[in-house]
Every structure is written in C-alpha cells, then in structure tokens.
C-alpha cells in the first residue's frame, strides 16, 4: 500500500484539525498496545500510520474515538455546586451588624476622596 495521506482520510473526517486530534488519540491507544494482536500484523508501520490507514479504511468508529477523547480530557465527571444554601445563610448571619451599610456597584463615592501617591503627594482622580 502506498503512503497514506490526509487526503485519503478526508472522506471519513473532512476537517483536518479534527482528523489530526482523532488520529493522534488512536495512535496513542495503539502505542499503549490496546490492540496488541493487530499491531503485530502491521509491525513494520508506526502507530500514526496504522491509525491513519484504519481511519481511511473506515475500520475505526469516529464517534467512539471522539467520545473516548472527550472522556480522557475530563477532569471530573460531576461538577459540585460552589456554594451550598447552608453556607450562604451562614455568611448572611455573619454580616447582620452591617445592615445600615449600603454596598453597591456605583463607585461615585470615590470621586470626593483624596488619593496620595508613594511620595506623599496628592493627585487628582479626574485625569
């Protein structure tokens, strides 16, 4: 068989970037000897060449490769909530004494303040 090229695989996976990612993943699986019996038959070829040949021949399930790739990239299977309701109630209880203080997103109260730089000199904030 002649050298395999990316054009041979374009019929199966039209996007070259996707082809590279999936072929790399499959080559890594081959390199870790997931399919040891089949590698021995094609021993003279390296795993990337074997992966590209199998993708071009349609012997590899692209959907299964994609799912395997996604699963390998996941760090956690379930995302835990950042704040539980009990914790948020506890935080509210800690700041009950600040009920008179209004905290908003408006920073206009900073306009009247005088800021001092490192040398102890005043500078204006209107610049």
Curated annotation (Swiss-Prot):
Alphabetical UniProt keywords: DNA-directed RNA polymerase, Nucleotidyltransferase, Transcription, Transferase
Molecular function terms, GO-annotated: DNA binding; DNA-directed RNA polymerase activity
Family of the protein in this entry: Belongs to the RNA polymerase subunit omega family.
Matching Gene3D superfamilies: 3.90.940.10
Organism: Rickettsia peacockii (strain Rustic)
Official protein name in the record: DNA-directed RNA polymerase subunit omega
CC annotations in GO: DNA-directed RNA polymerase complex
Lineage: Bacteria, Pseudomonadati, Pseudomonadota, Alphaproteobacteria, Rickettsiales
Pfam family, one: RNA_pol_Rpb6
SUPFAM superfamilies: RPB6/omega subunit-like (SSF63562)
Enzyme class: transferase
Gene name as annotated: rpoZ
E.C. number(s) listed in UniProt: 2.7.7.6
Any one Gene Ontology BP term: DNA-templated transcription
Catalytic activity field: RNA(n) + a ribonucleoside 5'-triphosphate = RNA(n+1) + diphosphate
Subunit and interaction comment: The RNAP catalytic core consists of 2 alpha, 1 beta, 1 beta' and 1 omega subunit. When a sigma factor is associated with the core the holoenzyme is formed, which can initiate transcription.
Matching InterPro entries: DNA-dir_RNA_pol_omega, Pol_omega/Rpo6/RPB6, RPB6/omega-like_sf
Purpose of the protein: Promotes RNA polymerase assembly. Latches the N- and C-terminal regions of the beta' subunit thereby facilitating its interaction with the beta and alpha subunits.
């Amino acid at each position: 068989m002649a050298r395999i090229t990316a054009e041979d695989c374009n019929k199966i996976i039209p996007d070259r970037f996707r082809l590279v990612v999936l072929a790399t993943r499959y080559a890594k699986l081959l390199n870790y000897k997931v399919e040891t019996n089949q590698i021995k038959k094609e021993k003279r070829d390296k795993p990337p060449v074997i992966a590209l040949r199998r993708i071009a021949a349609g012997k590899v399930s692209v959907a299964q490769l994609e799912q395997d790739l996604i699963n390998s990239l996941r760090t956690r299977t379930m995302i835990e909530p950042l704040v539980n309701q009990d914790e948020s109630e506890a935080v509210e209880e800690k700041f009950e004494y600040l009920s008179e203080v209004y905290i908003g997103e408006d920073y206009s109260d900073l306009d009247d303040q005088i800021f001092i730089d490192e040398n102890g000199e005043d500078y204006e904030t209107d610049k």
